[in-house]
From Swiss-Prot:
UniProt catalytic activity: di-trans,octa-cis-undecaprenyl diphosphate + H2O = di-trans,octa-cis-undecaprenyl phosphate + phosphate + H(+)
Encoding gene, per UniProt annotation: uppP
Protein name (record): Undecaprenyl-diphosphatase
Organism in which the protein naturally occurs: Gemmatimonas aurantiaca (strain DSM 14586 / JCM 11422 / NBRC 100505 / T-27)
Organism phylogeny: Bacteria, Pseudomonadati, Gemmatimonadota, Gemmatimonadia, Gemmatimonadales
Role, per record: Catalyzes the dephosphorylation of undecaprenyl diphosphate (UPP). Confers resistance to bacitracin.
Enzyme class: hydrolase
Length: 267
């Protein structure tokens, strides 16, 4: 893999990971359409390290508050504040994704990366995102998230193991179904993505280093993912404060149709 290819894939990862359009689908489809060799799931996960850095920096105040809350809970054995509850809810939301990742890891690396699976997932989740977002009332904010909400959204995160579903797409759809407003569901989705992304990076980064080495392309890809992720996070949070998820749903469906049309033309 060249430095240029790694940078392109890093930008693709960074721009699409925060958006409900499936970064894994874009990372699998980009080499397919450009005629590059598939760098594999380990490289994709390594690029997530760049996104993780962007998330940590963007939400640094929230994480500092939650770290303080976790320390307070450990000392007092009491849950008293909104931040205390959020710590417990994020832990609860992370567990289903961790279990799903362990059980479905082999399928995620092989069968799930099929263009047919990706195109189908893009279209189906796009329709679900549009329908749920359109008919869910704007009712609750982030401070009103309950343990039940966290577990349901966490279970939805498991679906993201299928490229084309999108972690952001599945969790934001679940959050809107639970009648959380768009800015709140976006922020909660980002916060809950960090522990599971960190776990995936810890597990898969050694594989990426073995396959690609601690090389300039790998480092360039991670850096490109970090910068573009920070940009995408800031743009999305401003956008959903005023607009629906409709544009992302339409994009998903159109991309899925393009993939199917391309596959048909090559057979």
């Amino acid at each position: 893999m060249t430095v240029w290819q790694a940078i392109v894939l890093g930008i693709v990862q960074g721009l699409t990971e925060p958006l409900p359009v499936s970064s894994s689908a874009h990372l699998a489809l980009t080499p397919y359409f450009l005629g590059w060799s598939d760098p594999g799931l380990a490289f994709d996960v390594a690029l997530h390290f760049g996104t993780l850095l962007a998330l940590i920096w963007y939400f640094r105040r929230e994480w500092l508050e939650m770290i303080a809350s976790a320390w307070r809970i450990a000392r007092t054995r009491r849950v008293e504040t909104v931040h205390d509850r959020r710590v417990l809810y994020l832990i609860a939301a992370t567990i289903p994704g961790g279990i799903g990742g362990l059980l479905l890891n082999d399928l995620a690396e092989t069968t799930f990366r099929s263009p047919v699976v990706i195109a189908t997932s893009l279209i189906v989740m796009g329709i679900l995102l549009w329908a749920v977002d359109r008919w869910s009332a704007r009712a609750r904010v982030l401070e009103e998230v309950t343990l039940r909400d966290a577990i349901i959204v966490g279970c939805a995160q498991v679906l993201a193991l299928v490229p084309g579903v999108s972690r952001s797409g599945s969790t934001m759809t679940a959050g809107r179904l639970l009648k959380l407003d768009r800015p709140s569901v976006a922020r909660f989705s980002f916060l809950m993505s960090m522990p599971i992304t960190l776990a995936a990076v810890i597990v898969k980064m050694p594989d990426a280093v073995r396959e690609h080495g601690a090389s300039l392309p790998l480092l360039a890809g991670v850096a490109a993912a970090a910068v573009s992720s920070w940009f995408a996070i800031s743009v999305l949070l401003r956008y959903v404060a005023r607009h629906s998820f409709g544009v992302f749903a339409v994009y998903r469906v159109l991309l899925g149709i393009v993939v199917f049309a391309t596959l048909a033309s090559r057979t």
